[in-house]
Structures are given as structure tokens and as C-alpha cells.
């Protein structure tokens, strides 16, 4: 059916969430969808619970598809809170991670410290992502759209390769989403128009959010927190191979 694929592969960034996938599951997933994403986040603090050989083997497998891997922000925040940042960087390097997420979703990091850690991550050779937003919806709602814009641009100036807009796994009542998971269009537009689009990644766990971001911004919009069994689904949305985007791109 290749002759029906008018758009073809989309050059973009897609981040997938690994919540506890076994090695064989990852093998099968990559066989089917390994060409459709390039960032893999081990969810929350799950990496602490795995045998380290499993982590090393999975990282090697992901890397064979040119997919960057990282632990997500929770372990970074724990390390920073416990003054164990050097140990953290050494450990992720030892286990084969090649990317880092700098965040303060559950803790507080002042702007100077944040910039310093972004710079440190870059100096150590890691692909560096940073995240804007709080895990607690009430605290997250205290950010104005302009503050989010300023934080994004500040992180990019500090050296962040990609800035993630917090959306959590639920995609509700957080960031650019209301309590029903609908996109707040004015916020979306303001952020998009005042930041480098190629360096902003929107967490969009729900299909309706993926559709709206693709149709509103473009099919190469950077998207994250994609469920591992919905990678191909997202790719069809990007290519206009599903009813939601068919004939609309």
C-alpha cells in the first residue's frame, strides 16, 4: 500500500513512555514501530526497580534504532534534592542512557541552578531535555502563559536541546490542557508563536490532543508521553492515514 502514502515519513521528534516493558516486548515493539520515534523515557522512578542488566540491554536495543533513552525527571529531581547529582550522572552513563531530563515538576530548583545543570549535562555529552511545569495541577496553574514562554526560552539559551511542556500521563488539568483534556488554544498559540517550534515538545498522551496539535500546528510537531502501543497510531495521524487527519494535512 506504499503507493497510497502521499506524505511519507515525517521528520520530527516523538517521545514514547516506557512504563515497564520487558526486553522481548521492546524487541517486538521496535520491529513494528522502531522507525517512528526517537526518544524513549523510562517512566518516573521505575529504573530503580529494574535489574541493571535489563536496563543496559534495553538501552542498547533502543540505541540500535537510533532512539535516545533517559530516565525522566523524577530520578533527576531526587538526585538534586539529595545532593547526589554527580552520582546520578555517573550512574546513567554507566547504565547506557544517553539523554537527561532536567525538571522541577515535584521539587524546586532556582533558575541559576537549573541553567548550571543544563550546562553540566551538555558538557558531559548528554542530549539534554528540560521540562516546564508542575506535577500538581494547582501549582501548575499558577504559571502564566508568558512565564512559560520565558522559561522555555531561558532553558534554550542555557543549552537545552529540547524543552518539554508538562502534560503528565493523564493530559488533563495541566499545562495547555483543561480539566477535560481539551487544548487551551490561546495558550497553545501564544507559546508556539513565541518559542522555537523545533525545540519545544508537547506532552500529548490523548489521541484527541495529538490530532488537534497536528492539525493546528503541523504534522511534524514534536509530541511526547506517547503510549508504547500507540506509536503506529500517531504515525498514521501524522501522515493522514487515519480519518481524523485524512485530507486535512
Predicted features along the sequence, with ranges:
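Conserved N-terminal beta1-alpha1 strand-loop-helix module at the mouth
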Residues: 1-59
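Active-site mouth loops of central-metabolism enzymes
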Residues: 9-24, 43-47, 70-84, 132-147
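Hydrophobic faces of well-ordered beta-strands that scaffold small-molecule active sites
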Residues: 11-18, 37-42, 69-73, 100-102, ...
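Active-site-proximal loop/turn and secondary-structure-junction residues that shape catalytic pockets
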Residues: 19-21, 44-48, 73-77, 104-108, ...
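Active-site-adjacent beta->alpha loops and helix N-cap segments on the catalytic face
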Residues: 24, 48-61, 78-87, 104-127, ...
Amino acid at each position: 500500500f506504499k503507493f497510497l502514502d502521499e506524505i511519507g515519513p515525517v521528520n520530527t521528534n516523538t517521545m514514547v513512555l516506557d512504563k515497564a516493558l520487558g526486553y522481548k516486548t521492546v524487541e517486538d515493539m521496535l520491529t513494528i514501530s522502531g522507525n517512528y520515534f526517537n526518544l524513549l523515557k523510562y517512566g518516573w522512578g521505575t529504573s530503580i526497580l529494574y535489574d541493571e542488566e535489563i536496563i543496559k540491554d534495553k538501552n542498547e536495543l533502543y540505541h540500535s534504532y537510533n532512539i535516545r533513552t533517559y530516565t525522566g525527571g523524577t530520578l533527576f529531581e531526587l538526585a538534586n534534592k539529595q545532593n547526589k547529582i554527580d552520582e546520578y550522572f555517573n550512574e546513567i552513563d554507566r547504565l547506557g542512557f544517553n539523554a537527561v531530563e532536567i525538571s522541577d515538576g515535584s521539587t524546586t530548583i532556582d533558575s541559576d541552578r537549573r541553567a548550571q545543570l543544563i550546562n553540566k549535562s551538555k558538557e558531559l555529552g548528554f542530549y539534554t531535555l528540560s521540562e516546564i511545569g508542575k506535577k500538581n495541577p494547582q501549582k501548575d496553574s499558577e504559571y502564566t502563559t508568558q512565564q512559560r514562554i520565558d522559561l522555555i526560552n531561558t532553558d534554550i539559551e542555557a543549552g537545552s536541546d529540547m524543552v518539554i511542556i508538562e502534560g503528565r500521563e493523564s493530559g488533563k488539568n495541566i499545562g495547555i490542557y483543561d480539566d477535560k483534556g481539551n487544548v487551551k488554544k490561546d495558550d497553545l498559540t501564544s507559546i508556539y508563536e513565541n518559542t522555537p517550534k523545533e525545540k519545544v515538545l508537547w506532552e500529548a498522551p490523548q489521541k484527541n490532543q495529538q490530532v488537534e496539535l497536528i492539525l493546528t500546528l503541523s504534522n511534524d510537531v514534536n509530541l511526547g508521553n506517547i503510549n508504547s502501543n500507540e506509536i503506529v497510531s500517531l504515525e498514521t495521524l501524522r501522515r493522514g492515514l487515519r480519518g481524523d487527519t485524512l485530507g486535512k494535512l
